[in-house]
Amino acid sequence: MANNYKDLFIDIDSFDETNIIYVKPLLFFEASRHMGIYYEKEIIMKKPVVNPSNKSNKSKKLNKTNKSNKSNKSDELKKSNKSNKSSALKKSNKSSNKSSNKSSNKSSNKSSNKSSNKSSNKFPDKSDKSDSSNDSDNSDDSDDSSNDSSEFETIKTKKKQKIIIKTPKMIVPFGVKEFDNNGRKNYQMSLSFSTMTNLYNEEEIKKFHGFIKLTDKINEETIMDYKDTWKLPKGLKYKRSLQRLSKDYPHHININMPHDEKMGFMFNVYDEKGGKSKPDIIDKRSIVSAIIELTDLKFTDTEFRANWTLLQVRKFKPYSPIQEFFMTECFICDEDNPEDTVYSKLIEKYQQTLKTPITFPQYPQMNPSHSSSGYAIPYITPYQSNYPIPYPPTYPTTYPTTPLFSEPTIPKPPQQPTTEPPSGFKPPSLSELLSAKKLLKPTKTTVKGVTEGKVVESDDHTSVADIPPPPPPPPSISSDNSSPNKSVKSSTKSSTKSSTKSSTKSSTKSSTKSPSKTPVKSPIKSSSKLSDKKSPTKKIESSGESDSESDSESDSKTTKKSTNKIKKITNNKLENSNTKNNKKFSKKKTISLDK
């Protein structure tokens, strides 16, 4: 029964109203007011059929095979007898030539040969029989199988059963309703024929609506035709199964939910996953699919109606399988964003469900504009970059083409590394160097341990800086300790002579260079008291001469390259040299006065 449970359902498309049977019980409408309804369903079965012509053909074939076997056996016996006789004659000739002592052996051989010949004649080979019989059997079996496979007989039988139908997914508009019938509880559930369910089953609901409408019509017509014969009340009316609250609402059908006070509900309720549950899960506006049965017709004094009973019910989700599919994952890909991973996640999830990995098409299939010699650059989709191709294509090996007359290629000379200066460094220009020279401050040479003296005004209105003399030199080491004064006198004389000579020389030089220029007063301060000791003028004069000579040499070089600015600098230096000469003349005057 479990394997053929679909045979219990009645197909709405092939429903025949003439097969409906009404069964009137005993003492109808007096004792029992229920009338049974059944349906004669046709069941088609196929059986293999064996025709009588096939039987006669089989008998003829068997007779032919037996005759052929007999003829083959007789031919074999004749051949065996001839061969035995010829062998016996040859042996007898040979035995006559031999001695009489072997006569007994010959007789025994003859007797044995005869016995073997007889046995072979009486019992031919069994292997031949078995082979021939097997061949005939196989041929017969093949003929039978061919006949059986080609011909079947269709047998139609009628089965009397209840009208059982599986409803499509429908809405429960009011939920489960409970009634009290004289202390007994009755439960009822309604199914709406509304097509606003977003379940894509409008056609199935229309077919079911037409089937219920047809059964209502047949029930009403048959009962009204037999109302007088069955002695039913004259004012009896039929209450249709398709009910409607108003024109604003669709039709609905009421289904009884069998219930017993001891056993409870006598049907099963299943949840969305197919597990057993309680009727409490069937709420208002829930979507269910039920198996219902047209059990009987119930009569009262005023009306009669069809009794639809619930056999099984299952609750479903309030949306279609397509909508449920789109609720599992995100299927909206952002084609403008290359970093979008929605499509890659879908492919990964799909690959996990497959037993074998997805084989992507090769490049020639994706880009058919490839040439016969080689492959063109493949077109890569925006989502293909995230996934490597499991089977990379094998490109043909390309060989470099060489021209017929190729020119010799000269190797390039090795490039020496060039040491470039850093980008931030630039050598200074000549103008920058000259401007930097201007900024240098003039320095003053000083001697350690020598204090500056006062400025003494001479008769010629010239100021001279009186520099105090340095300490006396150490005494010379000599053998005579009694002549220290002589050494002092000689040193003073030599110093005076050298100072006079150097002063005259420097004065003559300065006078020749700048005869027209007047001497400039020096801003050097002198001390208040003049020292009586002699100053070493020779050393100071020599240092001044070396400075003037170095300055004159540098001036001569710069005048050739520099502009008018350099000439001004040379003039200033000449003025400084004049001031030094004036100082020397003033020093001579002071020395002469001391003397």
Curated annotation (Swiss-Prot):
Residues 137-146, 544-553 have a biased composition (Acidic residues). Residues 410-420, 467-476 have a biased composition (Pro residues). Residues 559-570, 581-595 have a biased composition (Basic residues). Disulfide bonds: none annotated. Transmembrane segments: none annotated. Residues 83-122, 398-409, 421-430, 477-529, 571-580 have a biased composition (Low complexity). Residues 50-159, 398-430, 450-595 are annotated as: Disordered. Residues 123-132, 454-463, 530-542 have a biased composition (Basic and acidic residues). This is Uncharacterized protein L291. The lineage of its organism: Viruses, Varidnaviria, Bamfordvirae, Nucleocytoviricota, Megaviricetes.
